[in-house]
């Protein structure tokens, strides 16, 4: 793991082109496009041609552990090499972290730049997890997606979605109706009084999430 910073910067600009070594990296670059949406006005072109591009992402055996990557930024271009897909995602997240926090909110478009650096990075821990407990408190789809985005920002790679306790089962799956017909209910007991009082104060209602309304994917 190393970081070398030099003078100069790579300026993000309209009309940028991003190259990838193969089409399997298109979803990863889609993540980068979402990041750049608040930075530049025009759409970002993605191509499998490595010539005349501003950023290039390549899957390549770098000799490192899974999730490792090498990132080089110059005033002219940014190049990333990674062992695997997760390394590409981590490199994109590093690009996001090198930009000012102002890119995280929509506003007037400004000129942003990335410092000239050379980075070789690899995860210290293989399992970097976060658990979301949706069994006792409802989370809508946008809130779950926001949690996943923050996980990506902090390079967490394991999402534990805690959906079931004696308090209920939170996703309706038509193939398994008993999960909600029986699993979503239980008898009242004395431990519920405090929770019910809190729920009344906060005005939060638990309810089922239809299966077709959820799209949480790995990547």
Predicted segments with their positions:
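Aromatic/hydrophobic pocket-lining residues that form the small-molecule binding cavity
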Residues: 88, 144, 213-214
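Contiguous, structured surface segment used for ligand recognition
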Residues: 1-125
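Loop/helix-junction capping segments adjacent to catalytic residues or to phosphate/diphosphate-binding pockets
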Residues: 26, 89, 138-141, 170
